[in-house]
Amino acid sequence: MSQEVMKVQDIEVPKGGKKQGYLRISERPAGAHQIPLTVINGVGDGPTLVINGGEHGSEYHGPAACLRLQTELNPKKINGKVIIVPMVNTLAFETRWMHGNPIDYRDLTGCYVPEIQRGGSGPPLISYQVATTFYREALSKAQYRLNLHGGDLEEDVMEGTMYGRTGVDEKRDNDNLALARNFG
């Protein structure tokens, strides 16, 4: 068995290991802006999967599922790697803010580089900082992603699974369809 290490920012996890930590986004007056995550490196080779919740601050089912999964998933029983991010939009969660965040009012749903604009010549918008860091450190390392939503407070969401077809890579599109079907 090789000793391949999975690295996400300064978190390093050897094969068969699991480690919790934070993605550092930026500094703010109240302290560092960070996003919690768990990195799991299975014993065997395989693809990398990102599972995230909390793109909206008042969606609780996705983060709850992520927290349970990061506790229960045993790296000794899986192949490949899993990056679990229970709460992407921590600023919205801290304030129970629906649809975006309370700082720049941008919605992160599916909007990762290059869709979220930097925001002029001054410091970049916080949503841009979150999106670029999450993309660079997690999404760009993965072949697959489960983005868990549960509906904001005022929404009545029917149960279902959606997946995206790129129209560019037929194998990836078919793999995404199979993943969505297996997920339910």
State where each predicted segment sits.
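Structured catalytic-domain cores with a bias toward divalent-metal coordination
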Residues: 1-184
